[in-house]
A protein has these predicted regions:
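Soluble metallo-hydrolase cores and metallopeptidase-like ectodomains found primarily
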Residues: 3-5, 89-123, 176-254, 264-276
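Noncatalytic luminal/extracellular "stalk/propeptide" segments of secretory-pathway proteins
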Residues: 7, 12-15, 19-22, 26-130
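Catalytic-core environment of secreted peptidases
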Residues: 12-32, 38-43, 51-57, 61, ...
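Extracellular/luminal Protease-associated
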Residues: 13, 38, 91-186, 364-367
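Acidic/histidine-rich catalytic neighborhood of metal-dependent amide-processing enzymes
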Residues: 138-145, 149, 223-226, 248-343
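Active-site-adjacent substrate-binding region
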Residues: 222, 328-448
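His/Asp/Glu-rich mid-to-C-terminal helical/loop segments that flank catalytic regions of hydrolases
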Residues: 279, 398-450, 569-570, 574, ...
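Charged, amphipathic alpha-helical linkers/stalks
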Residues: 411-505
């Protein structure tokens, strides 16, 4: 360990970070449950407190970067009802980002609607009533679908009970998520324990009178602030970013109080140790990560996306790495993990090999995973041209048990894990600061494209797969050649620094600054060309979603030719978002399709343009379902329709392969400039 790393470790005070994490619970919108939500008074006051804290620990250039968003203030939601024995239950409920105001207690009729699908409403009049639904957002569908289904049928609001997937730690657990829908379709969350006595009455009586007192307010076009502080470096135009979000559901101890505290704990120790960075270190507490815009599929990570895309677009090409933090004071598995972009995989693997103080709670050591996923702010950073990473937080059971519930508290705080992450990520900051050039391996992304290639499949579709294979091979080799030069430059740079030859190190750094800008430009171009999403927010390459669709279509056609409509439906279920055509009204399906395909890019935020194609199979699914119920085996119209869909998807696949060839050539053009600069 170098001397500066030792001084940093000696100056760490994890108790300070723990106290700060607890202090973040101070401001809340709901006096009983917590919540520190986008644009709310609680978020604004917390932002002010964090700005003061940044000043107090010695960060410089502290500022509040304003962003425009939709705000949400959830004050309370309390449900009151009698059980079968006449006992009165008064239940605290969670809420989603929607409007609902009762102005005191208001009486409603409540109705049970099973899983909240269209079929559950048959024979029911729910106009003006509260509907109770049991949902599993992990294994079935997001809250937005049953909520909008309730709205379409005229319900006053939907009350969701988590049947599984989230909040599994205890039957008293509430849950909160981004709504992914409009503010005018109200929704609340009720625990399984509180719901069960009411459900018993509803199943017996069909309808029950309940009382509700609620205040949940969404306000469009509001403001909040990302809070920024710096440790100025010798290079003002080269930066390393540390980020964490300060909005939360409930008390949000792990998600994301400890992450903000980790970030500032690292900053505090760096300042106290007297560390003088070469690059400017930027610490950014992001607002509105959990939610920040109404009626958008991509309604989270608002603060981070705006920070990179709107507020500071000039950061692109200057920030060499974003170290983002999520839920860092808990062990999420037998191995710790860092999830990063493909291009930083090699560098991170080399870095974690040097970590020799991994806690016993991680018997399998540290894994490096890639690429980044959509669940956290690092995705918004990456697609904006800032190579990013996050401590892995999705691998363990915490997501199913405690995440986004009132059980995310310090009962599950692990001081050893928290301390380890302070040491590890502080060292990582210093490692990035000791580089002549960003260690971007552009060859790795082309290797990933080749890893998922299927030349036989592309040939069967008359797509230029062989040419893509050739071009990505050339690009991979070009990227690897440049990366070898980068690694050698960084090795020499570190050696010069270790030997105290600062002037020579500076000369080497200056030689590589222009090349580093080109590396970052190539990284951004690769993100633009190759990062796409499916309808379930999984990250993939442009051609992969259509290829999957074509495989399912081929199977569906074969099933119909064999006379099995039921098996064909199983195949169609997997295509794009058509699984929702099986369970919800056409109006619901169309709303959540159109708001992806036909909405202004700014309202889609980081998801804009990431879904390239869509096949609407609602009518086809409805027809096949009806024939399955009637026992009809004449599928001639459906076969003809499916063959048209197959032809359409085939054309999309050919276009996607061609697009990737052009994208590969564009990235290569940038990389060639580096190779030619000897």
């Amino acid at each position: 360990m170098r001397e500066e790393e030792k001084r940093f470790a000696e100056c760490l005070d994890v108790e300070y970070s723990y106290r700060l994490a607890k202090k973040l619970e101070q401001y809340k919108t709901n006096p009983y449950l917590g919540y520190r939500t986008a644009g709310s008074a609680a978020e604004l006051l917390t932002g002010d407190m964090l700005a003061e804290e940044m000043e107090r620990i010695g960060l410089r250039n502290v500022r509040k970067d304003q962003l425009r968003l939709d705000s949400w203030d959830f004050h309370h939601a309390i449900l009151r009802y009698q059980d079968r024995e006449g006992n009165v239950h008064e239940c605290q409920m969670g809420a989603y980002q929607t409007n609902f105001h009762t102005d005191g207690w208001q009486t409603f009729s409540a109705v049970y609607v099973g899983k909240g699908t269209a079929k559950e409403y048959e024979g029911l009049d729910v106009s003006g009533k509260l509907v109770i639904a049991q949902i599993n957002q992990r294994d079935e569908w997001w809250i937005s679908y049953p909520v909008y289904q309730a709205y379409v049928r005229g319900a006053a609001a939907l009350i969701a009970v988590q049947e599984g997937g989230f909040g599994e730690i205890d039957d008293s657990a509430l849950n909160a998520q981004d709504i992914g829908g409009p503010e005018y379709a109200p929704a609340f969350s009720l625990s399984r324990a509180d719901a069960e006595p009411l459900k018993e009455r509803l199943l017996q009586e069909g309808q029950v009178q309940v009382e509700l007192s609620a205040c949940s307010s969404v306000k469009k076009d509001s403001v909040s602030y990302n809070i920024v502080g710096e440790i100025p470096g010798r290079e003002e135009d080269s930066m390393i970013l540390l980020s964490a979000h300060y909005d939360s559901y409930f008390s949000g101890f792990q998600d994301d109080n400890t992450a903000v505290a980790l970030m500032l704990g690292i900053g505090r120790a760096l300042v106290k140790s007297g560390y003088r960075p070469r690059k400017t270190l930027v610490f950014c507490a992001m607002a509105a990560e959990e939610w920040g815009i109404t009626d958008s599929k991509y309604d989270w990570s608002t603060g981070a996306w705006q920070q990179a895309a709107k507020i500071h677009p000039e950061w692109q090409g200057k920030v060499t790495a974003d170290l983002n933090f999520e839920l860092p004071a808990h062990a999420h598995g037998d191995a710790d993990g860092v999830r990063t972009v493909y291009e930083y995989e090699d560098f991170m693997k080399a870095f974690v090999k040097e970590i020799d103080d991994v806690p016993a709670v991680y018997p399998e050591g540290i894994r490096v995973l890639c690429p980044v996923e959509t669940m956290s702010d690092d995705f918004s950073m990456a697609i904006s041209g800032i190579p990013s990473m996050v401590n892995d937080f999705t691998s363990g059971q915490f997501m199913e048990t405690h995440y986004h519930s009132q059980f995310d508290n310090d009962d599950f705080y692990d001081a050893d894990v928290f301390a380890f992450h302070h040491r590890m990520y502080g060292r990582l900051v210093m490692a990035f600061d000791r580089l002549a050039a960003a260690p971007l391996d552009l060859g790795r992304v082309f290797q990933a494209i080749r890893d998922c290639a299927d030349l036989e499949f592309s040939a069967s579709k008359n797509a230029p797969g062989e040419l893509l294979w050739q071009k990505t091979g050339e690009a991979m080799e070009l990227g690897k050649r440049i990366y070898r030069r980068v690694k050698e430059a960084n090795r020499c740079y570190c050696a010069l620094l270790d030997e105290g030859r600062e002037e020579e190190a500076l000369q080497l750094r200056n030689m590589w600054k222009g090349r580093e800008r080109l590396l970052l430009e190539a990284f951004r171009k690769a993100q633009d060309c190759f990062v796409r999403l499916d309808w379930h927010d999984q990250v993939l390459f442009p051609h992969q979603a259509v290829r999957q669709n074509l495989c399912h279509l081929e199977k569906a056609i074969a099933c119909l030719e064999e006379g099995s409509g039921e098996r064909a439906l199983e195949c169609l279920y997997e295509i794009d978002n058509n699984r929702y055509a099986f369970e919800f009204d056409r109006e619901v399906f169309d709303h959540f399709t159109d708001y992806v395909m036909n909405q202004e890019p700014d309202r889609l935020q980081w998801g804009a343009g990431r879904i390239m194609h869509h096949e609407n199979l609602f009518a086809l699914v409805s027809s096949l379902k009806k024939k399955a119920e009637e026992g009809c085996r004449d599928f001639s119209p459906e076969l003809a329709a499916l063959r048209e869909v197959e032809a359409s998807q085939n054309a999309c696949y050919v276009d996607d392969i061609s697009y990737m060839i052009h994208g590969t050539e564009k990235v290569m053009q940038i990389l060639m400039k580096i190779e030619e600069d000897k």
